[in-house]
Amino acid sequence: MELSEITRSTLVSTLSRLLRRHKESNPDFFLIRSKMFIGGLSWDTSKKDLTEYLSRFGEVLDCTIKTDPVTGRSRGFGFVLFKDAVSVDKVLETKEHKLDGKLIDPKRAKALQGKEPPKKVFVGGLSPETTEEQIKQYFGGFGEIENIELPMDTKTNERRGFCFVTYTDEEPVQKLLESRFHQIGTGKCEIKAAQPKEVYRQQQQKQQKGGRGGTRGRGRGQGYSNYYDQNYGGYGNNDSYGDQGYGGYDYSGYNYGNYGYNQGYTDYSGQQSTYGKARGGGNHQNNYQPY
């Protein structure tokens, strides 16, 4: 049965209205459909090179190539955000993609199930001399702060060598995580996404499944809003990429090792062992070894 012009027009109008409402109430659903992970990049491929190549499939709104925070070298992968989700389909329909003489590996971005974008960051290597006002001033430049936690040593009643900063939304966290180290006051601090204690325990259980001694040291770090500085050094493990400024994108099924993504950075599991001593005989900086 053929629809009349009036019926067809009404149907199109109704569907457009419903789609618009769905977009307004589920913005992340449409954002993730337009985002891609690009692996296997040449060390020489620049952001401009990648943008120009992918622009043939549609308008590119944003493009990022991740670099080593210490050496500044490309880590061989990046992310791209298209204006329209159909551009992602076009990229995937093409069997091979070659850029700068190397086959690249584009994949559709996948949001982690049940994982909210991080709004809280862990700040390690914080000098005890850095004032709360300096911390507020620096981090306030990235967005609206909801809360700052400055843990105290219960024995000495002095500030610990780390803190937590919570924002009202996730955008400031993503901006902060674009750089691993930040100059705050007189010292260089390390910024990492904070994870709730239950997330940390779930990750630990996965890693220690079938092994012994999985509960050892679990009491460490409790009392700081139930957050741990867990596994922040590992870039090749399950959910790690969601904590590096990409708001919870899941690439756990991807063999990152082929691209050298596991940089072997220090694992700060148990904040007391790394940032724990506030002054400790004046040797605070020696307790912080990120390199």
Swiss-Prot record:
An example GO CC term for this entry is: nucleoplasm
CDD domains for the chain: RRM1_hnRPDL (cd12758), RRM2_hnRPDL (cd12585)
Q: Does the keyword Lipid biosynthesis apply?
A: no
Where does the UniProt entry say this protein principally localizes? nucleus
One Pfam short name:
RRM_1
Its annotated compartments are: Nucleus; Cytoplasm
Q: Which InterPro entries match?
A: hnRPDL_RRM1, Nucleotide-bd_a/b_plait_sf, RBD_domain_sf, RRM_dom
SMART domains reported in the protein's UniProt record: RRM
- Tell me which Gene Ontology terms the entry assigns under biological process: regulation of gene expression
Q: Where is this region: Disordered?
A: 196-226
Q: Which residues form a coiled coil?
A: none
Keyword hit for Ribonucleoprotein? no
Ranges for the RRM domain?
34-116, 119-196
Q: PROSITE patterns, from UniProt?
A: RRM
Function statement: Acts as a transcriptional regulator. Binds DNA and RNA.
Under which name does UniProt file this protein?
Answer: Heterogeneous nuclear ribonucleoprotein D-like-B
Annotated source species: Xenopus laevis
